[in-house]
């Protein structure tokens, strides 16, 4: 599947970094270094816009290298009708400031099908063994 990408400013196209990668790595597009203080968040432009086919979405995900350093990425959905610059929300959960420079790989992007469903309101749902037990009820 071909997905048209429009680069913005000094942006770089997302890339698969290995033959078995399921996600594309995305790069920060910054004019100046971004400093994210502990427990703060920052919106990082990724330097591209795209034209996803109808019926698909892009999901912005964390990179393990960033997460291991205490910098998480808020999960984000890019809909097929969005044409603006794709951005990532980085959250510094560490106790030291995080530095993001232009061209740093800051997140991953997964392109996947986005099924459209029809909501059917009902008074009853079928019973299951699990029922309404949640939040750790299935064990570790």
At which residue positions do the language-model features occur?
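DUTPase catalytic domain/fold
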Residues: 1-140
């Amino acid at each position: 599947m071909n997905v048209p990408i429009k680069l913005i400013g000094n942006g770089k196209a997302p890339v698969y970094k290995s033959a078995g990668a399921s996600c594309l790595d995305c790069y920060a597009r910054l004019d100046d270094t971004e400093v994210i203080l502990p427990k703060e968040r920052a919106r990082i432009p990724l330097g591209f816009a795209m034209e996803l086919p109808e019926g698909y979405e892009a999901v912005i995900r964390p990179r393990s290298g960033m997460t291991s350093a205490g910098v998480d990425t808020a999960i984000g959905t890019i809909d097929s009708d969005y044409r603006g610059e794709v951005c990532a929300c980085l959250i510094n959960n560490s106790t030291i400031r995080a530095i993001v420079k232009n061209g740093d790989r800051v997140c991953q992007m997964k392109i996947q099908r986005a099924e459209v469903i029809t909501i059917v309101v009902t008074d009853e749902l079928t019973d299951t063994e699990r029922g309404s037990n949640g939040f750790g009820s299935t064990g570790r």
